[in-house]
Amino acid sequence: MHLKIVLAFLALSLITIFALAYVLLTSPGGSSQPPHCPSVSHRAQPWPHPGQSQLFADLSREELTAVMRFLTQRLGPGLVDAAQAQPSDNCIFSVELQLPPKAAALAHLDRGSPPPAREALAIVLFGGQPQPNVSELVVGPLPHPSYMRDVTVERHGGPLPYHRRPVLRAEFTQMWRHLKEVELPKAPIFLSSTFNYNGSTLAAVHATPRGLRSGDRATWMALYHNISGVGLFLHPVGLELLLDHRALDPAHWTVQQVFYLGHYYADLGQLEREFKSGRLEVVRVPLPPPNGASSLRSRNSPGPLPPLQFSPQGSQYSVQGNLVVSSLWSFTFGHGVFSGLRIFDVRFQGERIAYEVSVQECVSIYGADSPKTMLTRYLDSSFGLGRNSRGLVRGVDCPYQATMVDIHILVGKGAVQLLPGAVCVFEEAQGLPLRRHHNYLQNHFYGGLASSALVVRSVSSVGNYDYIWDFVLYPNGALEGRVHATGYINTAFLKGGEEGLLFGNRVGERVLGTVHTHAFHFKLDLDVAGLKNWVVAEDVVFKPVAAPWNPEHWLQRPQLTRQVLGKEDLTAFSLGSPLPRYLYLASNQTNAWGHQRGYRIQIHSPLGIHIPLESDMERALSWGRYQLVVTQRKEEESQSSSIYHQNDIWTPTVTFADFINNETLLGEDLVAWVTASFLHIPHAEDIPNTVTLGNRVGFLLRPYNFFDEDPSIFSPGSVYFEKGQDAGLCSINPVACLPDLAACVPDLPPFSYHGF
């Protein structure tokens, strides 16, 4: 009996041990289930930032609502919601942050003065007046507005004619309705026989500008096959119509001309009559298949996922509203409704490097033998680089663990809109050493630092193109601005013959990928060790010198040249002209070695091409003449372009070339303006989409004697070990810690998407 008790006790003990082992092994702390990685690094010590200033933060939902309520009360009951407004109505088109004057902002940030009043800029379309116009109103102070002032003349030198207004949704809708209900019924047999049109299988793509002279509002509209899930931009049918929609009453709109296969007609009725009589040359265009070449559906079944980047010790940055802080950098980002991504008060180790770095404009100019394409000059700020940024996809548009930030906007409708995930912030591991050296002469050692950067990103989907905007901040104090282009190409119908190939490559059965240029303009308001800066150009020349130890032999010795560019005209480097290989903004402070502290500007852009100066559209695009210009900073020269240029490109409200008037640049607050551009000749590999690879341009700001040494040497991730040391020890080499530190599960948020 005693033996049975002992055996039973042993059996019970074994069961208990197995049960405990199972619990330990399967619990979150057990070896089979590693712990979750921290979301924020406990070692990250954000650099102190002077308060949580709201100077540059985009307007909140509450502020936008307060401005709308105030304007509705002040402007009276005649206002119509912009989403339904007809051309003859009054409506509030947009509301966004009015940036404060720089002097007042710096007084608050640097000297503790009260913050300047927080204000909004509203654009109001007055179509219901005897003399319709566009007005710009500043409203403040927020969040409880009590005043508004008209700044139209102050900002633009005079009133804004009504024909310059952006096209509202209701006008776009009415334009297509006019074609569908008034014009297309004039050619039912031609349309159904030639394009298989059934009332819903065609859509229009517009040319801009809308006319040929100031005051016009007439748009060439090219028809494309429109099938769900298929990129309509790749399916032109060859039919284009010129719609005059200048009249405020859509009942008075008319089609002035029709273009088909190289010929112009009075209207679709004439086209129908010639088709019925058999005199019309036609090319029948079948409907595209749903899963054809223009579809972005994968041609393969799902396979292994791409590599996942994660931070085993947690993020090295934090996002608080619009403020981003890390152990090295701090800045505030903004998201202009029209101009898009911008950053302010950019500081490295607490010292301001830049007051503002921002996108100004994005233009593409097309060529082909159809009227819609040959006229097209898209100025994308007018469509809204910011308003068209939304729905970034985790794991594709941004790393999966990126911080996704929602943006509130008010444009084109009377209610506040949420742009979910319009901006993302993340750390970028670049798979490259920022610096390294393996020494084997005299002694043996290795030192290096893996390159990583802090990135803020938005993506503007403007019509067919998608522009990926990044501002990238590095541990050595460098700041990069870059843009990648992707999306669908714009196409024209290819009639046949070699003449069509003067404007691009054939990319489909009857499809021409049309040649075009891209140009992007950036504003760099740098404050290099203060507000007083100089522009310095350095280069090298070879000079002959007799070898001192043997004068019979001559050497060609490189020698530095240095020039202070003291006037604006000296810094206006035309597109295509050579830039000094080193050009930097210098301060009146010196580093430990007696050199002026500076920041160098490098432009990453192939040799561009600008529209000829004799073009009557050129002055509105005059910023594109220059790859680089440095000017005195002025509040009245805050932007290089205007949203009103798209619909009146012949009478610009802002002419950037006029900023350059040979003023002194010696010890002044300076702004550098950078143009980055490239040529795109579409080809077969642009189908279905243009890839980002090879379609990237931008600029780089690099410290030049700003520090006494490379500040990245203080990075905690630096690696150094010598011969004889055990590089596998964590105490010697921080990279050796990774197998233990990375033994955690990334804390991944569930995937969600709200971009539609």
Swiss-Prot record:
GO terms for biological process: amine metabolic process; catecholamine metabolic process; visual perception; xenobiotic metabolic process. Ca(2+) 2 binds at residues 568, 637, 659, 661, 663. Residues 1-4 are cytoplasmic. It comes from the Eukaryota. Pfam families: Cu_amine_oxid, Cu_amine_oxidN2, Cu_amine_oxidN3. It catalyses: 2-phenylethylamine + O2 + H2O = 2-phenylacetaldehyde + H2O2 + NH4(+); tryptamine + O2 + H2O = indole-3-acetaldehyde + H2O2 + NH4(+); tyramine + O2 + H2O = (4-hydroxyphenyl)acetaldehyde + H2O2 + NH4(+). Glycans are attached at residues 133, 198, 226, 662. The modification 2',4',5'-topaquinone is found at residue 465. The active site is at 380 (proton acceptor), 465 (schiff-base intermediate with substrate). Cu(2+) binds at residues 516, 518, 680. Its cofactor is Cu(2+); Ca(2+); L-topaquinone. It is an enzyme of class 1 (oxidoreductase). Induction: Up-regulated during in vitro adipocyte differentiation. InterPro entries: Cu_Am_Ox_Cu-bd, Cu_Am_ox_TPQ-bd, Cu_amine_oxidase, Cu_amine_oxidase_C, Cu_amine_oxidase_C_sf, Cu_amine_oxidase_N-reg, Cu_amine_oxidase_N2, Cu_amine_oxidase_N3. The keyword Nucleus does not apply. Residues 26-756 are extracellular. Its EC number is 1.4.3.21. Binds 1 copper ion per subunit. Binds 2 calcium ions per subunit. Topaquinone (TPQ) is generated by copper-dependent autoxidation of a specific tyrosyl residue. SUPFAM superfamilies: Amine oxidase catalytic domain (SSF49998), Amine oxidase N-terminal region (SSF54416). Ca(2+) 1 binds at residues 525-527, 669-670. Expressed in many tissues including adipocytes with higher expression in retina where it is active. GO terms for molecular function: copper ion binding; electron transfer activity; primary methylamine oxidase activity; quinone binding. Catalyzes the oxidative deamination of primary amines to the corresponding aldehydes with the concomitant production of hydrogen peroxide and ammonia. Has a preference for 2-phenylethylamine, tryptamine and tyramine. Could also act on methylamine and benzylamine but much less efficiently. Homodimer; disulfide-linked. Probably forms heterodimers with AOC3. This is Amine oxidase [copper-containing] 2. The gene is AOC2.
